[in-house]
């Protein structure tokens, strides 16, 4: 057993209001520079829809993730080593800029400088790539916001598989949900396997997947290899970049920027302990519908004395074990089984999980009360969002885990409503879904009224155990041939030439020292 720790995230889709605050703050901090105008490390999609980039879930088109061979061995869907190297100079499945969108701004200055005329001046769009004026904006990162666009395009959503999707184009059957997305920082990342230069690595101490900018050669195979399409090519620097899970903040015990600024407080951060020796076995599971359960078996119980003893022997710091015991991610994913992984069928074992959303009643005919089939809880099938759609999104098509999560949340609401509105303690609903009163009370606290310290349990890192800091003492940071080493290049991250400081200590005023 090889015990490792990972900082994971859970997003409660039942509380997401689609405000895009997480996207804007992430963009301002990490990708608001030349070459990354089109890149959104965090974006919020409206489902159903084809997403950003277009059809990112269609792995028949983009060849991301892993496939299981006849022998049971995993191979990147993009191909084996020879196959990847054979198309290194011309990748046929690489998303183009039009699959994302052409980034643009507006001629705001024209509003100030326009001469007096008969008509009001307008700020026309201008491309951030070519600098030319754009006649028409054809796509954007949130083009499908609030079900924007025609249903014919949204119907290409891969999560409609095994469903009669035509019926959901009718107004009375329309449904929608928000899906915030970021890098999954997988346990079995396919981007690492497809990088020819070996520039992508997974940090041992916290599981964050990063790209070494010194090793990256811009082959962009990682972009195709990532099934979530969360790696972006910086056309200015010639390097690939991705979400870094705000690791400078994580190392100091602070949450990521997207989590810190989330208006709906839907994000939870915590530590999970897992057995690295079981990753290959879990990812190689024969049936895709079993991948969720196999991944759960990889995680270790942080309260088990045997696990604690072995973790200490293997060098896991004590504060990391304590954080794992208080982790909201472990509670939501393992204790209560409410959180589910995004597209486990990609076999990457993702570590950003989602609590499925409860939705309104499907029709007015049910407004008087949901059908209950003789039980205390109403029939989940009568909710507006189809269970099969959520299952295709979060559990590889298996409706069992989704039904369990939805029923447990409904049972919690039924219990708290009877307690606060009717003044009685009705435990029939929670007993029906296998929960105790103590579990439901704790679920309510975490899902409804959790404090800051409940949602974010992040131990400070021990960088002294991860790497030798001595060789980095004169490090220059993130530069492109300019900066502290005094290069003559004209390139500067802030689009201006580097200006050397002038020593004025020896300059004397006129008349001094005479």
Regions found by a protein language model. Give the residues of each.
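Non-ligating segments of multi-cofactor redox enzymes
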Residues: 1-514
